[in-house]
Each structure stands twice: as C-alpha cells, then as structure tokens.
Amino acid sequence: EMTSSLVGSEMCIRDRMNATEDVEKIASMVDFVFCAVDMKKDEIKALEERYAKAECPVVSNNSAHRHTPDVPMVLPELNPEHIEIIPSQRKRLGTKRGFIAVKPNCSLQGYVPALFPLSKFGVKDVLVCTYQAISGAGKTFKDWPEMVGNIIPYIGGEEEKSEKEPLRIWGHVDDEKKEIVPATSPVITCQCIRVPVLNGHTAAVFVKFKKNPTKEQLIEALKNYSGVPQELNLPSAPKQFIQYLEEDNRPQVSMDVNYENGMGISVGRLREDTVYDWKFVGLSHNTVRGAAGGAVLCAELLKAQGYITKK
C-alpha cells in the first residue's frame, strides 16, 4: 500500500486507505496532496491526473510531469510566475480546483539558484559536476555499505535532468500556446557523481558570460538576491536565500548543509577560470530544499497566490 507516501496524512494511515485506489475518497477529505511515489512514470502521470481531476491539487516531487507543457515546474524564488499557467491546465483537465505543480530535480538545486541572479550578466555556457549524497537515492550507509569509501561516477537519468530542467525554469509562459516554453540558453553540460555523503549535493560550476562581470559584481548579485517567498515571508522560506562564503574551504557539507534549516543555498570559491570566465562551488540540502522542503515551499506559494484553497 502507498499511504502516507502520497498524502502524508494521519487519517490515511489510520484508515488504511490506498493512495492509488481510494483516489476519490482521499481527494474529498484533503485540501491538496503531496505526491512522492515509487512507480513507473506513466503510472505516476495517470495517478497525479486522477487526483487533479478529482478536484484535488497535486504538489509533486516526481519527475513524471516535469515536461508536461502546461504543468509548472517551480523553484519558488526563481520562477513563481510559471504558476500563472494553472488556469490553462485546469481548462484542459476540466477542473475548477484541481491541478498539478511539480518541483525540479534535487541535483540542480546547488547551482541553478546561484546562476539565476547572475543571468543579468548573460550566462552563456555552463559546465557543472555534481557530487550527490546517498540519501538522494533513498539510502543510508547501513543499507548501502558499498558506498562507504567509494564513488560511483553514474546516477541514472540525473545528467539529462540536470541539463534540461534548468531551461524550463528559465522559460516563459506563452499565453497564446497555453504552455511553458523552455529557454534555449544557456547551454549546460553536466556530470553527476554519487559520493559517500549522507546529505548534501555539491556542485562545481564553470560559467561563460556574454558580459564581463567583476568578482565584486557577482558576489553582490548572489548576496542581494531574494524572491517572492522572501517578499511574502512564507513560513518555510529562508530569510537569506543564498549565502556567499569567503573562506577557501567552504562550502562544506558538515558545516553548511543545514544553512537556513536546509532551505538556503551556500556558494563559495568564486574565482576566474582559464577556460571559462568564472567558477564556483555550490551546496544544497538534497532532502530539504531539494525534495520535501522545496515541495512545502511550493505549496505555501500556491496557497499565498490563491491556487490552493481550503474546501
């Protein structure tokens, strides 16, 4: 049975409801659902649409609908305007309340938030290597002992997500086409590596710019960036979205992964590069900002903007 994994609701655990079979009953009892299930992609797509069509908004951690044209993929500080596509989605689904919104993959949370405020300098080409914690695979060292003292240079599907999903975040809502049109730049190439760390995804990032910013301009842009969640003072929003660390040995997982209760992004080691223009290191908490916390913040944004309402 998939009970609490879908809705995280005490009543579903108590009543032993099955999240894949009792859709209409669950949808009638809750204001919205979070979805994070281990199923085939086409099954997840169908399940999330069933909840939406049952007039129950869905905030999804799954990748199934991340490229559905009228489903917003939201990183709340970066592209909150994408939720404006929801009325078009509701029209397609034939719903009044129901819709689907998704959050992006955990792998990109350590570098896309840092690149976003730098886009005013014309981000052109990006090379990134991510070093991803084992909790991203739902594992601990106890049940994945082969990861102790080991590195695996492959994580299935992560590199494609890490290259394509940022372009959708950088995209725009096309009112005429009634869809989100992905951006065509920057060009991103990525390698994703599994490392023996429990929590925290680190990214080594190399960037070419159309303009020629100074180090001071880049750091100022990072430190001063804030988004709608900060303006609205949403409960889960970090006060300072991005922190820049001056020390040469930061950010570190052991010292910085829980910055702003795991909802903030840590950046450091910004310096000029001999092949690209600039390089830096980013760090995010993959199971907080990159998963559950990011979904909660997305739901808070949707409630604040009137898309999730109490029945």
Describe each region flagged by the PLM:
Residues 1-8, 13:
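Single conserved hydrophobic/aromatic residue that forms the stacking wall/gate
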Residues 190-194, 199-311:
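C-terminal active-site/capping subdomain that shapes the small-molecule cofactor and substrate pocket
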Residues 31, 56, 98:
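Conserved acidic residues
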Residues 21-46:
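Rossmann-like NAD(P)-binding element
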Residues 36-37, 62, 104:
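Glycine-rich, N-terminal phosphate-binding loop of Rossmann-like dinucleotide-binding domains
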Residues 87-122:
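Short alpha-helices
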Residues 9, 28, 109-230:
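Active-site-lining helix/loop region of Rossmann-like oxidoreductase modules
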Residues 42-95:
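Rossmann-fold NAD(P)-binding glycine/threonine-rich loop
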